[in-house]
Structures are given as C-alpha cells and as structure tokens.
Amino acid sequence: MEGFPQVDAIKLRGIRIAEIILTNIAAAAWWVFKAINRFIPEGTSFQPAWAAAPLLKSRQKSFPKLGWPRETDSLCPKCVKEIRTKILSGQEDLRLLIDGHPGELKATIREQDGKIMMEKTCPKHGFFSDVMAIDSAFFSRIERLFPGRDLKAITEKLHNHGTSSIQYGRGSVLTVDLTNRCNMMCDPCFMDANQVGYVHELSFEDIQKILDDAITIKPRRQMSVQFSGGEPTLSPLFFDAVAYAKKIGYYCVQAATNGIRFTLEPDFAKKAREAGLRVAYLQFDGVGNKNHMHRKISNLFDVKLRAIQNLYDAGIDVVLVVTIVNTINNHQVGPVIQFAIENADKISFISFQPVSFTGRDEDIDDETRSRQRYTLSHLAHDVKSQTGITEPMRDWFPLSAVGAVSDLTDYLKGPAADWGTMKCGCHPNCGIGSALLVSKKTKKWAPLTQVINIERFFEDARIITDSARGPFWSKVFVALSLLRNYDPTVTPEGFQLTHLLKKFDKQTGGALGGRLGALDNGNRKQDEWLILFIAGMWFQDLFNYDFRRTEMCIIPYATQMGEISFCAYNTGVGWRQIVEKMHMNATTAEWFKEKGRNPIYANKKDLPLPEDAAPLTLKVTTDDWTGAKTGASCQSGGCDSGCGCHN
C-alpha cells in the first residue's frame, strides 16, 4: 500500500505533461486557423426561426455611449415622486408616462478624484450627485469588455411604456410578483411590503396570460422565470404557477424567497421541487445571526441554514442573494463567499446586490445615502481584501461579456432552432461577475481565470461566430480555443482538462456535443469540481438612474400592464405603484377581514424552528448561531483547504 501515493503522483505528472503538449499543439493550430481565416470570406448570417432578423456579426452590434465624460438621460428624484402622486390621485393621466418625458433631465457621468460620479441639476429641485464607482480604472475595464447590444426588441403592446420600454434583447429572467404580501418587514425593501395599504395578488388566469404572452415575443430566447413578491410562497397559487411555467417550457423556474416557509414546513421544498422549482434565490445578508438583525428576526441565520438544508434535500439549487449596504453588512462579503465555498455542493451562485434606495428607502436623506452607498467597484475590491480571492483588474467581467458564448451557441444551433440561447445582454454598469472552481471533496479552489484565459476565450468565440465556418469546424475551433487558453501548470491539485471540457459543455447546452447537464441538479451534484459564480447586480434608484441601462434590461417585470424593465418598475417613474394600485384586489383591511392575516415576523424575536428536523449537514465558520450553542451537527472551524480565508 505504501507505493500507491507514488503511483498516483506519477500518473498525475503524466496527465499534466499530456495536457501541456495538447495545449501547445492547440495554440499552434489556432494560429494556423487564424492565418487561413483571413483569406477566406466569412460565412453569411442566417435568420433563425426564433428571431425577427438575422444574427448579428460583432461589428454590426450597436453600443451605448460609454467612457467619460459622457451625457445621458436620467430623472429628478423629487419630480418623479410628484408626478407619480398626481397619476395615482387621478390628477394626471397615465398616458403621460407613455407619451411624455415626466421628470427626465440630462446627467453627466465624469471622473473626480479617481471616482466616477453622476451629476444632474433640476431647475426646480437643484443639484444631485452620486458615486458610480470608487475606482475609475475598474469602471473603465468593465465598460471596455462590453461586447455590444443584442438584437433590437420589437415594440408592441407588452413593451409600450414610453422611455421606460426595453429596446434591446429579450431578457434573461422574467420576474413575476405573485403577491405583494410578505411575512417579514425588511429594510431595505423594493416594494415597501405590508405598508402600502392594499393587496395586489395575481389570479391563476393572470399568471397564465403573463407567462403565455412572454414566450410569443421575438427574439424568442430561452428565459428563466422568477416568481417574486412580497414573499411568493404566501400565494395560494405558488405551486400552480411553478408547475405551469415548467409545463410551457421555461428554461429554469425560480423563486425569490426569504426561506421561512421552506424552513417551517419541511415538505414545502419537496412539493416545490415536484411542481418544477429548480432554483431558490434565497435572501441572505451574512454569516451569523447578528448580521441579519436589521431584518428584525433574531435567529434569521438559523432559519436560512434550515431552509438551505431542506432545499438541498429536495433537489433545489440555492443562490444566495445578498443585499449589501455600506456600514451595515459590507464586511460580510468575505464570510459569505467562505460559507459558499465550504458548502459548494449546496450553493451554486452568490448574487451580491448593492443597495438600491427605493421602496421603503426612497426618501433617504443625502448624508445616509452617501454613507450607505455601495457600488460594484466596492464589491470587487472587498472580495479581494476580505478573502484574497480574485484580482479586480483580472478576474471580473461585465455580466454581458458571456454574450460572446451565447452568440456562438445561437450559431451552432442553426436556423431551425425554435428558441434562442439565454443571453445576459445588460449594460456593463448593471452587473459584473467572476467564478471560482471549487472541489466538493477538498474545498480547494481557484479563480476560473487562473485556469483559463477567459478574456481571450471570449475574443476567440467572437472570431469563431463571425467566421461562420459551419457547425463541425466551429466546434473544432471551440475545442482548440479551450485548449489553447487552458493553463495546466497552475491548476489546483486534482483538476484536469477533462473537468473543464465537461463544464463548458454543460454550461453551453452541449455545444461540444454532450448532454445539457446544466438542467439537471442531480447531475451537478455528481461532479467533483463545481463552478461557484459570484455576481454583482446593481439595480438603479432615482439618484443614479440611467435610461441607457433601462433600455437594455435583462430582468423584465411581467405584469398585468405588460413587461417593464426591473429598474423602471421598482424605481424610475414608479410603475410598480401604478400597476399595483390600478389592479389591486382589496384594501389591506378588506383582505384581512375576508381572508385573515398571514403571519408577519418582525419583532426582533426568535422564529420557533421545527424540533423534529433532521440534522444539518452544512459547514459553518462562526459561533453566532443557535446550532453552535446547542451542539447540533453543523461543523465549525476552518475548511482545511489552505485558502487563507480563516486567518
């Protein structure tokens, strides 16, 4: 037995040598391809069945104005509220939002002392200023890597909201609020849940029409649908909505949830999975109960752990959704990533969302806003300073950068495809992303950019798509690109080239000829190496509103009045308040009288947890949770990976 480790070491060295040889051959072959490619005319674009126009070559794509100084269209925070009040009271007609430009003004984006600022002046309400980035070099990098807009959206009844209309692409995540009721009283809250004085809740007929209408629009791209609220699990139609969305073909059915029902009702997750729920977007503000105290439940972290366990046991993937407020929980960026690494088999994604001062926080004072403002550049620097993971100027990309791979996949699917590939085509100021390779067994990790030159691979994908050499040769060139951009000399121990190829094949829906394993949660759990995505999604508020971002929104809100950009719905001119008020079911008092009150947990006390629940299998590095004090089976301490996160 003593010789086996030596045999394994020799085998691993042999694999590494073979990988180095392969990558060198691929690099040489790629340059041959590029040299020949210059002398052969590009293949022509085709119009797929799912689109209203031919696929775009990279040079045909349009771009918003980027860089600085630049001028854009924005809103006056005070004018907007005045106009919204008049529309809600009947003093102004709703057509003003469609035909006019209420509250709009010009804004300048410029550099000041290494920061990027937005400045605007209203003739009536004066000067407004807010920070867009604390690092102008990082801001410049993210804008430089933007690959261009998607196909033009067709303006029709679902997208007829004046200057708030989405004008490019199809979106990635269709968001549907099932109810504005909630069982918490969070601050911040996009919709000011439980405080508006009325209940807005969709009927099943509403849900069917909204979901049916959404898949008739061209470009007809694959979309996820996310049921939201309020708390969507309070809707009596939650399971029906999930099942219907799955039935008619939505790529991925998700729920944005606080996790309370998944915690208190162990069978709730199983029923949701049976209905077709694939992903839970779980509100998660940090590690330990003290980092959730602003949510007004004293043991909320314990609640989250139980929800994650129940969701995992039911086969539902978990995305941690972290609203970051400067001076409140910005110190939790590192601990949240560490928690996700230690539980990478249960957590597939972290979505950090810098605070948007809207809903319950729309009237924030200037001093508090300045203190609590958090940007995407804050996030990139906090990830490095708190964990040692990633370099801001190397490892972060605009979310839209992956559009190069979506374009390639669209080409490989051919003209007969009924659906286009899901595409994240948002403005570069909207979102950023990075990714880690994490071993499920050892918890060893590495930035994906350490293993593969992602920036160069995206450029290769653009060249392959523009060249249009047919599906067979394009797949050959994709394989060459992956090989030439892979660096076997710096991969974490145990990671091999075959792992990378399988991961790429799954993430692109079988672009290399394999099975679409990304649709199967069980398939992901069988992998030894997992990709943990870390994203920053910064939703706008009235202080930093930019209509160029609204036009390219990838998260359309599907409502009884059509599909509206996420930011135009939740902030902007205030479409949420208008839609909900015009389509409300009843006043809150009338609803309570007829249907009774749903519980609201908001008194800063413990939420009683089920006593007969199975032991938790999550690993937690903190003593600030009930399980650590009661001897429950969660593990505490370091992850023993040498990652440096526990110093």
PLM regions: where:
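Radical SAM enzyme [4Fe-4S]-AdoMet core and its adjacent flexible, acidic
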Residues: 2-8, 13-24, 31-51, 313-524
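N-terminal [4Fe-4S]-dependent radical SAM core
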Residues: 45-175
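Short, cysteine/histidine-rich loop/knuckle motifs that typically chelate Zn2+
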Residues: 77-80, 123-124, 181, 188, ...
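Iron-sulfur (Fe-S) cluster-binding segments and ferredoxin-like electron-carrier domains
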Residues: 83-88, 129-134, 191-201, 570-580, ...
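Conserved alpha-helical substructure of the radical SAM core
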Residues: 122, 127-129, 133, 143-270
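Radical SAM/AdoMet-radical enzyme domain recognition
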Residues: 208-226, 235-354
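C-terminal target-recognition/interaction regions appended to catalytic cores
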Residues: 501-629
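Histidine-centered metal-binding segments
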Residues: 627-647
